Amino acid sequence: MFINRVTILLALSLILFSCDKEYHAAGSELLLSTALKSKTFEAPVYSYQSKVNYFQTDGLPLAQLGKINLSGLGTTEANITAKLVVSQNPVFGRFTQKKEDEGDDDNSAVIDEKETVTQVYLEIPFFNNTDDKDGDGVIDALDLDPNDRDSDTDGDGLSDFAETNNNLNPLSEDSDGDGILDDVDQDNKTYDNENKIYEIDSIYGNRNARFDLKVYELKYFLSKYDPATEFQTQSKFFSNTDFFEKGFYGETLHDDSYQLNFEELRFNHKEDDPDTEDVDERETVETRLTPRIRVPLDKAFFQEKILDQEGSSVFSNDDNFSRHLRGLIIKTENFDDDLYMLLDISNARIKVEYEYDEVDTNGTADNTDDDTTEKKSKTFLLNFGLNFNTIRNNNSNTTFDQEVI
């Protein structure tokens, strides 16, 4: 009994002592009685301009073209060199060249199609601003209020959103130009709602400047892999690479004065559809292109290099074609004012338009007496492959003020 009482007393004592609160300042021994002091060190910082002699310019989604003079940086000029790529073994016209050559006794439609180039164009699109935060069909740069789709940019009493949804022009108070404002006009059917207004960006200097635009055949083989590394790594091309200066150019494909056009390009149908008597398709738009550089190229050159090679080994693989037609050099000269462009080179192309003969059997394949031969037309595209910029900077007469910051 005595032992139980002693045990209880000891337990109570431990409980009482454990409830005793005693505060200790954790880490107080780390604080010193003296305040921390620091010193200040001042040193001059020098900034200076350093010219970069060259840099890699291939593998980019854009290309530079033009000439511009910037204060303190001198004059910069940029040209483009590009490889061309095509699909393998293309067929021009309706039948393969082999079938044309061999003929077909059982098919009178198989003839020598006489494919002939009619037009060739080089096209390089501009970049255009498509930002439209409020989704009213008017890009922010032209929108009265880019954050309000009910804003009325053209002031005709209809919101931008309403006009876009009703196939009207939100940037014109009279979409069809008949003298009646859109908010009261009950007939706007003559307005082509597919017409677009573009806001072109990445063009610097005087957009109205004239210059000479020249396109040459490239005579240097642009290899995808670097022969200096035994073709183990991909080739790199730098801003100081100038194959024109080194003499690697052939025929002149275009040489003329040029001025940029920032309007949508529209092309009407070439032929009228006889089945639609009330509509003349030659007066309606067939194709629309965003604003771009678009210049004609030498037709005879592409007749020889492209159409006349149908069925040959030239089109059997990329290397064969690149050795046959190695690419283009695009140069600009003689600017009447500064103009420098960043272009959408990833969508650049050459468009070869051609016509060919086609037999119309008039639905009687077994009777050739009523067969007629007609001219048909098609388009063949050559896209840009590997490309790079040659960039020259002349700052020999430019002085820099080197200052201490």
Tell what function each PLM region has.
Residues 2-137, 141, 179, 185-405:
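Secreted, disulfide-rich extracellular signaling modules
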Residues 132-192:
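Extracellular calcium-associated, cysteine-rich motifs in secreted modular proteins
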